[in-house]
Regions:
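Core catalytic architecture of nucleotide-activated donor-dependent transferases building glycoconjugates
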Residues: 1-85
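Hydrophobic beta-strand segments of well-ordered beta-sheets in folded domains
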Residues: 15-17, 54-56, 75-76, 95-98, ...
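Residue-level preference for alpha-helix termini and adjacent loops
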Residues: 25, 71, 85-88, 104, ...
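Short, glycine/charged-enriched secondary-structure capping and boundary segments
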Residues: 33-34, 71-73, 113-115, 134-137
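Tryptophan-centered motif/residue detector
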Residues: 39, 64-70, 107-111, 126, ...
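Residues at the C-termini of beta-strands that transition into short coil/loop
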Residues: 79-82, 124, 144
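A donor-sugar binding/catalytic signature common to diverse glycosyltransferases
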Residues: 85-132
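Leloir-type glycosyltransferase catalytic cores
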Residues: 128-145
Length: 145
């Protein structure tokens, strides 16, 4: 889709950060739960601390709620309207750095990223219940949910 080339170009230039905020079906799920607003804001602030010129690319099933809830210092972009799942995971994995939600979709985006010096911020607890989880890499930054 040619109309998305400017969005793709923005991702490819500079310190692009994929911010994945999952709402929807996770809100009422007793196993997964949802990362708190405090987690996401702390992750955003930490990413700006590590990458002062970060460009935040927001991917969410409720972009309007994200716009009303979170504060960004500069350079924020929202996923294009009408993206299918394949397009979305492609754009997300093009980013250099990642703020993950506790979802496998979010996890795969950072895994598919080819940038070797990526910064990954993830919730320290992946599930709302005590289930063993070994998806974390040693170099990730874990924040409380």
């Amino acid at each position: 889709r040619n109309e998305l080339m400017p969005f793709i170009d923005e991702i490819k230039e500079g310190d692009s950060v994929c911010l994945s905020i999952r709402m929807g079906d996770y809100i009422k799920n007793p196993i997964h739960g949802v990362c708190s607003q405090k987690y996401y804001q702390a992750a955003i602030d930490k990413m700006y601390e590590l990458h002062p010129n970060a460009k935040i690319f927001v991917f969410s099933d409720d972009v309007e709620a994200v716009k009303k809830t979170y504060s960004f210092k500069n350079n924020v972009f929202y996923e294009p309207d009408g993206c299918n799942e394949l397009e979305k995971i492609t754009y997300m994995s093009m980013c250099k750095h990642f703020i993950l939600s506790n979802s496998s979709f979010s996890w795969w985006t950072q895994y598919l990223c080819s940038y070797k010096k990526k910064t990954v911020i993830a919730p320290e607890k992946w599930y709302a219940v005590d289930i063993p989880c070994d998806i974390y890499e040693d170099n990730w930054i874990l924040l409380s949910v």
